[in-house]
Amino acid sequence: MASMSLSFSSSLCSSRIPEGKRRFRHRDVGIVRCVLAASKSSPGSVTKKRLWKDGEFPGITEPVNQRRTPIKNVKKKLDRRSKANGWVNTVTETLSDLIAKKQWLQALEVFDMLREQTFYQPKEGTYMKLLVLLGKSGQPNRAQKLFDEMLEEGLEPTVELYTALLAAYTRSNLIDDAFSILDKMKSFPQCQPDVFTYSTLLKACVDASQFDLVDSLYKEMDERLITPNTVTQNIVLSGYGRVGRFDQMEKVLSDMLVSTACKPDVWTMNIILSVFGNMGKIDMMESWYEKFRNFGIEPETRTFNILIGSYGKKRMYDKMSSVMEYMRKLEFPWTTSTYNNIIEAFADVGDAKNMELTFDQMRSEGMKADTKTFCCLINGYANAGLFHKVISSVQLAAKFEIPENTAFYNAVISACAKADDLIEMERVYIRMKERQCVCDSRTFEIMVEAYEKEGMNDKIYYLEQERQKLMDRTVATKEMENLPAG
């Protein structure tokens, strides 16, 4: 496995390679327009000499300026201004590109560079995008720091900005911190929490199965005369279904059917189908699909993707194919998620041949692969024992500039464990930490299981110590942030 180890390390540690030309059905050409600022007149202008009396001639004569600026110097000034404007556009475009690619660390570095410039003006939209990015990247502490810096720059907080900060904490399951943000919002008249704020907090409580907090939040919303909308109800509906509380789920759904403010929609339909599909209850899933159709709710692309994924997990390939054909018939596009579900179905059973055929078709149709695509490919090749193709998948992901998130590293670590290459597994784990990618419970589970298989109890002990240190650092950081300023 020496060659495999070398390839893995070089693949993950190499710098990003810009994407080559791809074929797309539709290409949008971006046009960058740089506008040169008009030249200002010289402050030391010569006083104009009048050669007429008032009311005679509306003309003037200007004395010749013997020290007129040479044309070449004017051109140099214009070139400098053009380069400056071009630099501004380049930095802002780079920042937008990094945010779109979810590369939070590089985005913060570019943003810090931008803030040091004299022309910089703080904008609420930029902070909003960065706060959302940090929240989705599992960086609530950095989101809080960015929020504080925003206030120092003189920007006024808004409900939307506070909700984005609150969401950053909820995405990392820091519910107590999220409730603290909620309390701060209540203390500012211009930042009173709205239905979106409560929906975000409700989702966190639902995901953590803290349904007692769900009830208290509903009560608080009622006291503040905030009416739950369909999104709010869908969130709670999803939580009840995930933990198998079908009685409560049915009650929420019944309330939605008789409500005038939050009628069930296609998202409600998708949630119910996902609940039963993930549990493998195909009959219930199909039954509810027909019920929602009878309610007048039309399916969308995501609805069909849910059906395809559910059939794929149960290896019901005929029904999976039927749904795909039905999508074509109704002219619903096959999306990245559609292909991911098919690739995942073949990957789970190690069917590398059909997995590759699906991926090739995906690329031939100009469909863009994402992180999940490569996670499925890596898992599929590992399940098939084709570890050299795991390496090529990692290299291809780097070429396509696929974001390397926690799920991606977990897939590579799992592949190393299945190949019994524990040395490379440790290298990937180190690389994961160097990239400041957050390790989750799955990361440690994979490594502990690999060490247990080899009877390496000392490694397990040190790994548990590592996990405890990680938890302690998180707690210490939170405590430091909560210290009073000054």
UniProtKB/Swiss-Prot annotation:
GO MF annotations in UniProt: mRNA binding; rRNA binding
Signal peptide: none
Keywords, ordered alphabetically: Chloroplast, Plastid, Repeat, Transit peptide
Cross-referenced InterPro entries: Pentatricopeptide_rpt (IPR002885), PPR5-like (IPR044179), TPR-like_helical_dom_sf (IPR011990)
Annotated GO biological process: embryo development ending in seed dormancy; embryo sac development; pollen development; pollen tube development
Listed GO CC annotations: chloroplast
Transit peptide range per the UniProt entry: 1-36
Sequence ranges of the PPR repeats: 123-157, 158-188, 194-228, 229-264, 265-299, 300-334, 335-369, 370-404, 405-439, 440-470
Short name of one Pfam family: PPR_2
Matching Gene3D superfamilies: Tetratricopeptide repeat domain
PROSITE patterns listed in its UniProt record: PPR
Coarse class of the protein's main subcellular location: plastid
Localization (cell): Plastid, Chloroplast
Coiled-coil region(s): none
PANTHER family, alphabetized: BNAA05G30910D PROTEIN, EXPRESSED PROTEIN
Family, as annotated: Belongs to the PPR family. P subfamily.
Protein name in the entry: Pentatricopeptide repeat-containing protein At3g06430, chloroplastic
Species per Swiss-Prot/TrEMBL record: Arabidopsis thaliana
